[in-house]
UniProtKB/Swiss-Prot annotation:
Annotated keywords: Arginine metabolism, NAD, Oxidoreductase
Positions that bind NAD(+): G221, S222, S223, G224, T225, G226
GO terms (BP aspect): arginine catabolic process to succinate
Biological classification of the source: Bacteria, Pseudomonadati, Myxococcota, Polyangia, Polyangiales
Protein known as: N-succinylglutamate 5-semialdehyde dehydrogenase
Active-site residues annotated for this sequence: E244, C278
Length: 489
């Protein structure tokens, strides 16, 4: 099966066999062989060979190509959304939203290039000071499974606009989506070697990340993999490394009159995408008061009524499956561990059908756990922490090595002003779901959540480096020579 796109041709993998499955039915969605190290070499070589011509095409030609890709995406939106739903288990409505976001972010990427990079000139005496931006060359993109179309293209599109060539290695859990997307790039007329796709698991990823022929790497995924990449590229300052990783995100609730809206925002923050967004609320901080008790009671009731189902159900669910049986098993094991440490089950996360990755929402009160593990449980499991004062809530919120997102639901602006200043996070929301973020704003975190903002509006900053120069049309002597300088005897 030809599943790798190298130098403009589809080729069969020479590595180990692997497959992806629908997380509910376990039907095979993709079957093929991983790229071998030699095929990774070929992909990097193809990108290097295509780089100079792609760079020299100029911005307008490159922009025209990504705009054609946006048009092709629009023409094939329903089909790509169906593949995303089939392979990830997310509901069709959400998969369609993902494809639409892919399309919309292309305009954001073009705007960002012109506003943040591009070329700038200013007069500097008898010269012109010029800042131009030059592409790195060949960049690797490693994508996640939770948004297998949208998030990789958040790196790929800005990289191509800047003049780089790309070698893309998707998650081994979503190879079919990656193949479909690459075929759409082919339909849009991507030149041979400018975008290359290599499929596979850890071995393929290690070969690509460690390849001496790449000039940089953009990654979205787990902190564990991101940390491994950071170690692998250590001591190579000549390579740009931009990491977007996970979070153990806090959401604080205090002094809010509209309880129904608060419940909505908590549900949206915690359980959208079956909890498989890096910005999902993992920890819900609620005051230890009768009002807090009432809020939790209503939350548990509302969460218990969230519809969970197959991606293509006629009556669309709010939540689909998590990505795999293994992921579901890990989440259930995490719940059991937290209970063994002293957590109280407010709403049990359950496997809804044996042999599937369909999980119901789970809510645990972990206030009694003195040493709460600082872990990201990537699924529909939220941990409640009760607090006595806002000082304590802030302390609990920041008690994590991560720093991606943090949120406050409160009618009191003065609390938010303090929360914004003291929260250790790259995204800080007030009275909005924690999962909400603007494509025209930087996206990323601090600490173990990442080191740069290589997608959305700020992606342009990491896809090219600035070149500063002083320029004059002719050589001319200065009005006055420096002391001690004589040009004639």
């Amino acid at each position: 099966m030809s599943t790798h796109f190298i130098d403009g041709s589809w080729v069969t993998g020479a590595g180990e066999p692997f497959a992806s499955r629908n997380p509910v039915t376990q039907a095979v969605v993709f079957e093929g062989r991983a790229a071998s190290e030699e095929q990774v070499d070929a992909a990097v070589a193809a990108a290097r060979g295509a780089f100079a011509a792609w760079r020299d095409r100029g911005l307008e030609e490159r922009a025209a190509l990504v705009k054609r890709f946006a048009g092709v995406l629009g023409e094939h939106k329903a089909r790509l959304a169906d593949v995303i739903g089939l392979e990830t288990g997310k509901p069709r409505w959400e998969a369609l939203t993902e494809v639409q976001t892919m399309i919309g972010k292309i305009d954001v990427s073009l705007m960002a290039w012109r506003e943040r990079t591009g070329e700038r000139q200013a007069e500097a005496g008898d010269a012109t000071a010029v800042v131009r931006h030059r592409p790195h060359g060949v960049v690797a993109v490693l994508g996640p499974y939770n948004f297998p179309g949208h998030l990789p293209n958040g790196h790929i599109v800005p990289a191509l606009i800047a003049g780089n060539c790309v070698v893309f290695k998707p998650s081994e859990l979503t190879p079919r989506v990656a193949e479909e997307t690459a075929r759409l790039w082919e339909k849009a007329g991507i030149p041979a070697g400018v975008l290359n796709l290599v499929q596979g698991g850890r071995r393929t990823g290690v070969a690509l990340a460690g390849h001496p022929g790449i000039d940089g790497l953009f990654f979205t995924g787990s902190s564990g993999t991101g940390n491994a990449l950071h170690r692998q590229l250590a001591g190579q300052p000549e390579k740009i490394l931009a990491l977007e990783m996970g979070g153990n995100n806090p959401l604080i609730v205090q002094d809010v009159a509209n309880t129904e809206a608060a419940i909505h925002h908590i549900l949206q923050s915690s359980f959208i995408s079956a909890g498989q967004r890096c910005t999902c609320a993992r920890r819900l901080l609620v005051p230890a008061t009768p009002e807090g008790d009432a809020l939790l009671g209503r939350l548990v009731d509302a969460a218990s009524r969230l519809k969970v189902g197959r991606y293509d159900d006629a009556e669309q669910p709010f939540m689909g499956a998590v990505i795999s049986l293994a992921a579901a098993d890990r989440l259930l094991a995490a719940q059991a561990r937290l209970v063994s440490l002293g957590g109280e089950v407010l709403l049990e996360m359950r496997r809804l059908e044996e042999g599937t990755a369909l999980l119901s929402p789970g809510i645990l009160d972990v206030s009694a756990i003195k040493e709460l593990p600082d872990e990201e449980h990537f699924g529909p499991l939220v941990q409640v922490q009760r607090y006595g004062s806002f000082d304590e809530a802030l302390s609990l919120a920041n008690r994590t090595r991560y720093g991606l997102a943090a949120g406050l639901i409160s009618d009191r602006r003065e609390l938010y002003e303090r929360f914004w200043r003291e929260s250790r996070a790259g995204i800080v929301n007030w009275n909005k779901p924690l999962t909400g973020a603007s494509s025209a704003a930087p996206f990323g975190g601090v600490g173990s959540s990442g080191n740069h903002r290589p997608s959305a509006y700020y992606a342009a900053d990491y896809c090219a480096y600035p070149v500063a120069g002083l320029e004059a049309a002719a050589v001319a002597l200065p009005g006055q020579l420096a002391p001690g300088m004589r040009l004639n005897s």
